[in-house]
Amino acid sequence: MKHSEKYSSFYRLRVNPWVSMFIAFLILLVISPLITQGIFTLYPSVSAGDYPLFSSARLLLPSALTITGILVWARTMDKLSLKDLGLTQKKVFVSWVIGSLCGAGLIAVVLAGLILLGAAHLSWGGVSSAASILLGALVYAVRGLSEEIVFRGYLLNVMSSRWGMVAGILVNSVLFAAAHIFNVGFSIVAFINLFLVGTVLASLYWLSANVWLVSAVHAAWNFTLGIILGGAVSGTTQPVHLLTLHTEQGNWLITGGSFGIEGSLSCFIVLVAVRAVLWRRVVHRYSITSPFPQR
């Protein structure tokens, strides 16, 4: 399927985009967490950690429910196939490898900038179990996939089909950033950076029409930052990590403060540069001259 054909195919969407946004957020932020909480409330021994394998499933269940809910809604209400949502069956493994390298590389560049500024350094984190690292990779992979199916696979297409690609990317990225508003240490810089992350992922999606690739970038970014480097991922730190990231205290604008380096000036600079490169390719690929859809 050509990119132009994929973009135009979404004009047949049947559901109002505002309804689609409401349902998607309801599934992501309310229904999936509540079902998970209900299940583990009924089985307190699992929540208490008597069964480590099932206890670990608590980290994966909300994302699995979100993926299932969105796919069922998109298929039932909008008659969209997996391919329509960017879940192509071709080169899935290759897409994950390339995306993972890109995601890890981006966060490495952000960290390098902070180290050069003397605002960060690393120390050994003392991980005791390789299984914990692998579990962390799995959790971030499934979470990344669930968020990308929601934001890029479904919502981006819904918004772009009704409001045009440019407006779709902008609104989608604002919602993506706003979804993190209650995270620890959230700031205006963090919002701007997450908005830029959204535009980068959206641009990459329109260039590839491949949710696997975009999900891998998202997952590898979080995994590298949280599990490998031991930094806060959007305000959340992990108990198990390979290294420990130390940032200069008192200069939150440079380091991102308690939100983590995703809210840092270094991250802003890297994202602006990457976004500029990708957006030029999007404009060239789709010959964009207007922010509104050309029907």
Residue ranges, per PLM feature:
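Small-polar-interrupted transmembrane alpha-helices in polytopic inner-membrane proteins
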Residues: I107-V110, Y140, G164-I181, L194-G198
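Alpha-helical transmembrane segments of multi-pass membrane proteins
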Residues: S132, G136, I149, F191-A202
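N-terminal, membrane-interfacial amphipathic/helix-forming hydrophobic leader that caps
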Residues: M1-L82, G226-R295
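Membrane-interface helix/loop boundary segments of multi-pass membrane proteins
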Residues: Y7, S146-V171, S203-N210
